[in-house]
Amino acid sequence: MKKKIAGVLTTVLAASLLVGGNHPVTVQVDNMISGTQDDEDTQSDGAEVEAEEEQSEEAKVAADPEDQPAATETPKEEKKAEKETQKREAAENSSDSTSSDEKTLLRKAKKLAQQYDYTGAISVLKNNWKFATSDKMQEAAAAYMKKRDACVEYPLENITHVFFHSLIVNTSLAFDGDSDEAGYNQMMTTVSEFKKMIQIMYDKGYVLVSPHDMAVINDDGTMSKGKIMLPEGKIPFVLSEDDVSYYHYMDGDGFATKLVIDDNGDIKCEYKKADGTVVTGDYDVVPILDSFIKEHPDFSYHGRKGILAMTGYNGVLGYRTDGAYKTKKNLQDDQKAFLKANPDFDYDKEVKAAKKVAKAMKKNGWEFASHTWGHRNATSSTAAELKTDNKKWEKYVAPILGKTDMIIFAFGADIGDWEGYTSDNEKYEYYKSRGYRYFCNVDSSQYFVQITSEYFRQGRRNLDGYRMYYNPDMLSDLFDVSEVWDSSRPTPVPEM
């Protein structure tokens, strides 16, 4: 195996304590696979990030007036009425009981209804002029109204949040006895395990939602509780994935290498096989979940997918987009090795490609959160250090992924205790001033949700080797660990 960078895998043991009754206290938690990137190590002069060009085609060809038939002048109202009459007559005379337009509308409404947006489905049908004369559209709308009225409001405080790191594709490469094996075994999940987990959770009635469904920001800037309406028996949950940068140290260890858009416009992963062959497919959380929801649209609430918690020091989504790759200043050894192995590396092209993937992902229901630029521990870092770090995130990551109001703390750390954030909390006030309103730590409790007039806060549960091996009972509400455990995972899983 290749030589690894010393200290890049860092593990932090986490515990969730109950203090004063039922109040969870989050302490340092088992959340990370990458060490903090020091600010001093990667200072650079910065990089201009290309704005994505939107091209519009204007292909208006003027026809020769002599080739056009003579026009008969008709008042606008008369023309409009005539067109409406012609449309209705054409619909009435159609031999097909359901016109192609009606079929399209019914399909669109059905998709919305499958993801519990019954109001949207009804609007699609009722807002079309065909609705008044279409029995099929009226019947569908009536059915959706009945389903909407049967929905119940789910208690927000009982919504769990689960998270993963990059999935292991090839266990023989990840668990090969080198210095990284222990960290992978503790904090990673295999592709096989992930697929089994989501299938079981789907069968139990779980449905993906977003923190933005749980709490909404009002026009006056205050925050209030959202309302999640689902059929009786459905269980909303939030899913996130940390560090989807495909760090250099993971090369050759059985993980995907980047996210790409395939010929069908779908987000897939590139994966480099042991023989060097590069293949494209479902090799990590994003494409696996996308494919699953295509088959099971009712696993998603209003089109929601998951949240990617992103650092920036090695770039994003597998693209080497940090400014250091352009300026060549203060490079780490793995960055130097990458640039040496890729002498034709084009930074601007890399940034443009990453932006294209991020845009497609957001359009498809995915969201992005800051994980701090350098994977900082927000508990032990000073406010000044976090400010410096966040400036880098805003400079090198936000222009690619877009602005975000969510921060998912690295190492499962936090900037306050279980009682909540206050105005004298310098770290909180800074993040709030930069637009962050949704905050997530790591907590072993089944639920930890705080919603105030200023912020949303939620604890996350790690579904990894460590948690499955040592605390399988803590995951019983989601699945039976014995049904998902990958037998190729070495045991015992190392303690933290």
Listing of model-derived features with the role each one plays in the protein:
Residues H212-D213:
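A short beta-strand-loop structural module common to alpha/beta enzyme folds
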Residues H23-A150:
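N-terminal, intrinsically disordered, polar/charged segments of Gram-positive cell-envelope systems
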Residues A113, T119-S134, A142-V209, S224-P231, ...:
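C-terminal active-site subregion of NodB/CE4 polysaccharide deacetylases
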Residues K2-T26:
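Sec-dependent N-terminal signal peptides of Gram-positive bacterial secreted proteins and lipoproteins
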Residues L105, F194, A353-A354, D424:
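Amphipathic coiled-coil/heptad-repeat helices and related helical stalk/stem segments
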Residues E157-G177, E181, G221-M223, L230-F237, ...:
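Metal-dependent polysaccharide deacetylase catalytic core of the NodB/CE4 family, i.e.
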